[in-house]
Amino acid sequence: MRQRQERLSALIREEISEILLRRVKDPRISSFLVITEVKMSKDLRYAHIYVSVYGSEEEKKQTMQGLESAKGFIRSELGKDLRIRFVPEIFFELDDSLEKGDRILRKLKELGLEDEQDSE
């Protein structure tokens, strides 16, 4: 079952990326959006989609509102594309791990620690 969860997660991640890129026309949704992870529930009925948005807090807020309002459309498009018996309910969640990682790298660079690791 775990393998099926992972396969479906990867497939949903690809499909939603494509849907957001080509079919969703909401101007609130930032073009600097990355789907970092999709976690499926054990029964495959729920998909938590973690997104990272590069931009200001206002842009992040607008993007999340746009995703929330497009959720029904995205789910219906998933149903057409995936041809699975039950299309999972989707939940978008903001993921700031990429931003945190970027901040850590900048701090290391300021301290001169990043260059030492690169030279090894």
UniProtKB/Swiss-Prot annotation:
GO annotation, cellular component aspect: cytosol
Cellular location(s): Cytoplasm
GO biological process: maturation of SSU-rRNA
InterPro entries, A to Z: KH_dom-like_a/b, RbfA, RbfA_dom_sf, Ribosome-bd_factorA_CS
Subunit record text: Monomer. Binds 30S ribosomal subunits, but not 50S ribosomal subunits or 70S ribosomes.
PANTHER family: RIBOSOME-BINDING FACTOR A, CHLOROPLASTIC-RELATED
Function: One of several proteins that assist in the late maturation steps of the functional core of the 30S ribosomal subunit. Associates with free 30S ribosomal subunits (but not with 30S subunits that are part of 70S ribosomes or polysomes). Required for efficient processing of 16S rRNA. May interact with the 5'-terminal helix region of 16S rRNA.
Family membership: Belongs to the RbfA family.
Protein's UniProt name: Ribosome-binding factor A
Naturally occurring in which organism (per UniProt): Dictyoglomus thermophilum (strain ATCC 35947 / DSM 3960 / H-6-12)
